[in-house]
Structures are given as structure tokens and as C-alpha cells.
Amino acid sequence: VPAIGVTCTNPQITIGNDHYFRICFIDPFQGTVLANFAKDQFSATKAYCLAKQGDDYSVGLCNYFMKAFGEENCVYEVFPEGTSDYSSYVTSAKNSGADVFFAPVSIEAAALILDQAATQDLGMPMLAGDTWDSNVITEAAKGKSNIDLYVTTFYQEGGNAEFDAPFKEWINSDSTN
């Protein structure tokens, strides 16, 4: 039975399976795009990268980002399962001299990181992968004027007007969408 994944960005998912396909980009692509964006948009020469220990998505996307950015120009840290206080990581990022903060982590961790980054006035753009493309994150960032946030997204503006209008209406109708 053929299967089509719509959000499975890990390149390992379809390897060795002739019946499993994807329609989205993969992590090596989004990691490279985000690294290039950091360098091109912000003239970043140093990046702080934060991943969840043992999480294939988080660690993998950090690795793809660092490879494209230049590993020698990245500060890389991991946090363990169950972490709720990210203030030491935000402090570490601020003290590292980094120009951007990259954290491809879960929505739950992201909301906490955003709060703690705002509290400490992080002072650098925050970048993340497709998991942060969520109304939960938009709500968490709301009212935090000192947060400068950029994420990758599967949505392409202007693809089809008949699809775009009702999709925007649906996505904005409920913050859990």
C-alpha cells in the first residue's frame, strides 16, 4: 500500500521503502536554508544551536544547520528530556557571542524557550525548523516585542487563491490549528 508523508522531514523515513513517498522538504534542505538565511539576512558569523538530547529531529536538524553554517562557528548544546528551565541555555547563548539562536525543538520546549529568552532579553534572532510553524508558537511569542523569530514552513503564499483564502480562515479561526 503506497503512503505519502506530508510533514516527515527526516531523510531516513523513506529510505529502503519503494512505497513511501513525501511531498515536503527534508531536514538537510531546511537546515541549509536556515544557515544560509542566518548568514545572508543577519550577516551572522557565529550561531548558538540548542537540541534535545536523543531526539533524532532536533539533533539531526542542528547537525545539518551546523554543517551548512560551518561547525567551527557554532556553539552546540543539548538539554535532557524533562527540561523546563532553559534560562541557563539562554544565558549561554548570550555569553557565547553568537549572532543567531537556532533551536529545532518541540512546540512545548519552544514556548518555554521563547518565554525565557524574552525575560532575559536574548538580543538575537531566533531560528527554528518546521515544528515551530504553529499557532501555539505564535501565541507564545505574542506581546514579546524583544523576540525576533524566523521558522521554516510548508506553506507557500500565493500557490492557489481558491485554497489560500479558506485555509487562512481555518488556520486563524482557532489557535490550536
Where are these regions (language model features)?
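Extracellular/periplasmic periplasmic-binding protein-like sensory domains
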Residues: 114-177
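Beta-alpha junction/loop-to-helix N-cap segments that form part of ligand/metal-binding clefts
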Residues: 1-15, 23, 78-87, 107-111, ...
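Loop/turn elements at helix/coil->beta-strand transitions in domains of secreted/extracellular proteins
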Residues: 1-3, 16-19, 42-47, 70-74, ...
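Active-site-proximal beta-strand/loop segments in catalytic clefts of secreted hydrolases
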Residues: 6-9, 24-26, 50-54, 77-81, ...
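Structural motif
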Residues: 30-33, 79-93, 161-163
